[in-house]
């Protein structure tokens, strides 16, 4: 997401396609154009990138979204910012470039996490359990309350009785961050409030 002239309608089409395809998991990220690529040059040409202000040392091109998300959470730990609601925009409106990280969060939730509540297939639940465990351990260092919470949910659906620690960790991070508290409230995840 984040391509030039991408609209909310385009974003909703992406969400609908992902939902229709019903894969186990989707990797979603914000476009990070590399210098010396055609897309970078096009974005610079139409004014979406100021080449004079780009500091390539600040961008993690390998896993941009994870790094950006961590920075966003740290910078907003004590501030209350409006949570975007994808459906509150008209389909023709263009994605606001300065809000792509928050939009990424909402898209990631819509296509990866929301469906977990109704998942019944044991093979898929087992895959999700392994995947969420990896996200929590390796990618977020047990600091993302959404992935912690959904690992708890998946393991409960699999019949595990030892998931309270995951729920406690998730609640700790929600209580420690106004940004996470807003997100959890926006997603109506009452068990985390």
Language-model segments: residues:
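A structural motif corresponding to the C-terminal lobe/cap of the Radical SAM core domain
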Residues: 1-133, 137-139, 161-168, 172, ...
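A generic structural motif
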Residues: 28-31, 181-185
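Residues that mark the junctions of alpha-helical repeat units in TPR/alpha-solenoid scaffolds
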Residues: 137-146, 176, 180
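"A position-specific structural signal for the A-helix of alpha-solenoid helical repeats
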Residues: 146-150, 182-186
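C-terminal non-catalytic interaction modules
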Residues: 171, 175, 183-193
């Amino acid at each position: 997401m984040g391509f030039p002239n991408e609209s909310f309608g385009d974003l909703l089409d992406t969400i609908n396609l992902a939902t229709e395809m019903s894969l186990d998991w989707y990797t979603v990220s914000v476009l990070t154009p590399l210098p010396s690529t055609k897309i970078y040059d096009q974005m610079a040409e139409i004014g979406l990138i100021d080449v004079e202000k780009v500091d390539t040392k600040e961008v993690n091109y390998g896993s941009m979204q994870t790094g950006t998300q961590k920075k966003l959470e740290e910078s907003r730990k004590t501030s209350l910012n409006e949570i975007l609601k994808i459906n509150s925009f008209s389909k023709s409106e263009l994605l606001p470039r300065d809000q792509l990280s928050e939009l990424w969060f909402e898209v990631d939730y819509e296509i990866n996490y929301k469906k977990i509540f109704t998942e019944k297939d044991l093979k898929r639940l087992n895959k999700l359990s392994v995947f969420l465990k990896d996200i929590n351990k390796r990618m977020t260092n047990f600091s993302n309350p959404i992935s912690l919470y959904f690992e708890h949910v998946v393991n409960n659906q699999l019949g595990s009785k030892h998931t309270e620690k995951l729920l406690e960790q998730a609640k700790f991070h929600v209580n420690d961050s106004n940004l996470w508290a807003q997100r959890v409230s926006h997603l109506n995840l009452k068990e985390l409030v």
